[in-house]
Structures are given as C-alpha cells and as structure tokens.
C-alpha cells in the first residue's frame, strides 16, 4: 500500500530536511503513516480475522436462534397455557434466551474455526483460490465432528467441504 498521498511532499530523500531535522508537521505525518501501517497489519492478521468472524458469528447466531426458537412451538409443554400470562412470557423468554445463546455459540465457533483455518491455509499456500475454502471447509467440518468419532469426522469434513465448494462457486459465478 502506498502512503505517498498521506505524507507531505518534502518527506522523501531529496527534502531540504533529509538529514533528520523534520518539522513537527512532517514528524506527525510520519507517525500517522506508521500507525496506519500497524493497523493494516493487525487487521490483515489471521488472529484478527478469525476473532472478528467468531464475534460476528456469535451475534448472527444469536439473532437466528431467537428467530428460530420463536417459531418452534412443538417442544413447549401444553401445561404452560394453564399458568398466568406473565409466567408464560417468562418461561418462553427464558427458553428463547437459552436456545438463542446455544445457537450463538455454535455460529461463533463455526466462524472462528472456518475463517481461521482458511486464513492459515491461504497464508501457507500463498495463493487465493477456491482450494483454500474447500480445505478450510473440510477441516472445519472434521473439527466440529471430532467428538462423534472417525466416521463423523470424515462425513462432516466431506459435507462441509462440498458446502464450501458450492458457496465459492456461487460467489464467483460470473468470473
């Protein structure tokens, strides 16, 4: 990234102050350029990307969980309707909150693992192509199914890898 537009015109090597005697304005511009460079490096790191995906996945999962739990009425005990209205609202709100939190955790973990693995694979291969997403999908599917045994790991990896392939093909449809 070029910072030439952010620096004063006399900050280069042919400046009258090239010996290190910078004006306060030039020092401030140089410091600002360094800070912008640090911020760019931090925001492009795999840790930052995967953390943001986890946080945003948690938020989106909470919204989805709240919506889905409001539609699912089959698990509610019919005896709830015999209770006072406030008690019904309290019970349903507690259930909605717990299910929303559970979905939020799952979405957050999914976003964290997928984006972190895709970023690491991309950095290792030094390429940006569809194979990064497929490999990250296989890794994520397997990692999420690790508690269920080897067959679930293989099926989860294959399924999520195929899903990642489909999403990537859809996203790059016209290219």
From Swiss-Prot:
Q: Where is the composition biased (Low complexity)?
A: 1-17
Region annotation Disordered: residue ranges?
1-23
Q: Which GO terms describe its molecular function?
A: mitochondrion targeting sequence binding; protein transmembrane transporter activity
Major place of residence = mitochondrion
Its localization reads: Mitochondrion inner membrane
**Which GO biological process categories is it annotated with?**
protein insertion into mitochondrial inner membrane
Regions that span the bilayer: 51-71, 126-146, 153-173
State whether keyword Disulfide bond applies.
yes
Per the record, the domain of life is Eukaryota
Q: Which UniProt keywords apply?
A: Disulfide bond, Membrane, Mitochondrion, Mitochondrion inner membrane, Protein transport, Translocation, Transmembrane, Transmembrane helix, Transport
Q: Which cysteines are joined by disulfide bonds?
A: 46-119
Q: Topology with regard to the membrane?
A: Multi-pass membrane protein
Question: Which chain positions lie within coiled-coil regions?
Answer: none
User: InterPro entries in the record, alphabetically?
Assistant: TIM22
Q: Name one GO cellular component term.
A: TIM22 mitochondrial import inner membrane insertion complex
Q: What family does the entry list? A: Belongs to the Tim17/Tim22/Tim23 family.
> What is said about its interaction partners and assembly?
Component of the TIM22 complex, whose core is composed of TIM22 and TIM54, associated with the 70 kDa heterohexamer composed of TIM9 and TIM10 (or TIM8 and TIM13).
Record PANTHER family: MITOCHONDRIAL IMPORT INNER MEMBRANE TRANSLOCASE SUBUNIT TIM22
- Biological role stated in the UniProt entry: Essential core component of the TIM22 complex, a complex that mediates the import and insertion of multi-pass transmembrane proteins into the mitochondrial inner membrane. In the TIM22 complex, it constitutes the voltage-activated and signal-gated channel. Forms a twin-pore translocase that uses the membrane potential as external driving force in 2 voltage-dependent steps.
Q: What is this protein called?
A: Mitochondrial import inner membrane translocase subunit tim22
């Amino acid at each position: 990234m070029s910072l030439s537009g952010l620096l004063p015109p006399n900050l280069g090597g042919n400046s009258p102050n090239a010996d290190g005697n910078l004006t306060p304005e030039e020092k401030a511009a140089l410091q600002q350029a360094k800070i912008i460079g640090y911020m760019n490096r931090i925001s492009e790191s795999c840790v930052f990307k995967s953390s943001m995906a986890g946080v945003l996945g948690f938020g989106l999962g909470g919204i989805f969980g709240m919506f889905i739990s409001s539609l699912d009425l089959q698990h509610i005990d019919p005896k709830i309707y015999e209770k006072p209205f406030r008690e019904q609202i309290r019970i349903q709100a507690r259930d909605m909150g717990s299910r929303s939190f559970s979905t939020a955790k799952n979405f957050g973990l999914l976003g964290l693992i997928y984006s972190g693995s895709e970023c690491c694979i991309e950095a290792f291969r030094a390429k940006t192509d569809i194979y990064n997403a497929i490999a990250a999908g296989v890794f994520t599917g397997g990692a999420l199914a690790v508690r269920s045994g080897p067959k679930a790991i293989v099926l989860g990896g294959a399924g999520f890898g195929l899903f990642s392939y489909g999403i990537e093909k859809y996203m790059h449809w016209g290219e």
